Amino acid sequence: MSEASLSTYYTTIYPTKCPPDPRFLVSKEGLAFCCQIIGFISLPMHFFTGYCILMKTPATMKHVKLSLVNLNIWYIISQVIVSFFITSYNFYPSLASFSVGYATALNFPTVVQICILYTINDAVHVSITLLFEIRSSLILKNRFRISSSRGRGYWLAGNFFGTVFITSPVFFNLADQNAEKMKILEAIPCPSKEFFLEPITVFATSGAWNTYLLISRSLKSIYMLQIIFFTSCCIYYLVIVKTDQVSAQTRRIQARSFYGLIIQTLIPAAFTLIPSVLISSRSAPDQLVNNLVSISYAVHIVVGSLAILLVHHPYRLFIKSIFVKSKESVIVPVVSTSMFKVIK
């Protein structure tokens, strides 16, 4: 399919069939503006979270301090990339997108930008999974615990590079872009004008590549399977099986930390799951909803950092100490009026 066919569709069919969409958030400028505002507001919060982790983490949390620092660093990197450099403008439900960030202005190919975005997303997922692994391995009775730093290093490398290699072939096998765009127009006849004017990248979904995408997505769910496994270990050894070798206070502290980790993970996850459910429940695609998904993804990153502060008790106490000052008793001097009496 030639580029002329796509151009002909845009100049002849599109104006008569598709009325202009004046909504600001549908435009690439609206999406970029919202994500940049979120980025400017979020970065100070990320740095404050990093300060709390580095300076206010008590000795009882020393085993998870480095993993929290690691997660915070990847949150910061992800926020900068998503809010400023690679803000993804997606045409759901098709696998077509482009970036409205600064990386496009710097002439980075769209496929390279998407590859970078996927890689950073994988790093965040591995960092979250690492928190569950460490929480599980801190239980000495856990027969599945990773007890050595070398073993944990192999585990981290396998998780990160394994998922990156799984999805890499997709980025190096792009189909005929104009032909794929015409196929998308059959299902979505009235996309936003950016579909025709911007450097859209469409991933191959036909034939064997459709099967490969399904398999690769299934394999990427290994993050969730590992989290479920580590969670099961924690529940089994902290709640179901109780041993006299661990004091009740220690078990209570470990259980509280585990429950906090669950909440810390679920809070930001809700900001991505809810929009995804909203998209899947709609009968017709809406670019406004698509862009709201990208905005919610930018929001969920900073929500992840705030969840660290709100879930862990030492950080909550520090925040409270900033805003709530202890009341100081004010001494008001009392002067006797007898000193001012005039003796007649």
From Swiss-Prot:
Describe its membrane topology.
Multi-pass membrane protein
- The UniProt transmembrane annotation reads 30-50, 66-86, 110-132, 155-175, 221-241, 259-279, 292-312
Task: Give compartment(s).
Answer: Membrane
Q: Which GO terms describe its cellular component?
A: membrane
Q: Give the matching InterPro entries.
A: 7TM_GPCR_serpentine_rcpt_Srh, Nematode_rcpt-like_serp_H
Q: Which Pfam families match?
A: 7TM_GPCR_Srh
* Domain of life the protein comes from: Eukaryota
Q: Does the keyword Transmembrane helix apply?
A: yes
> Which keywords, in A-to-Z order, does the entry hold?
Membrane, Transmembrane, Transmembrane helix
In which family does this protein belong, per the annotation?
Belongs to the nematode receptor-like protein srh family.
Please state what the protein is called.
Answer: Serpentine receptor class H-72
Record organism: Caenorhabditis elegans
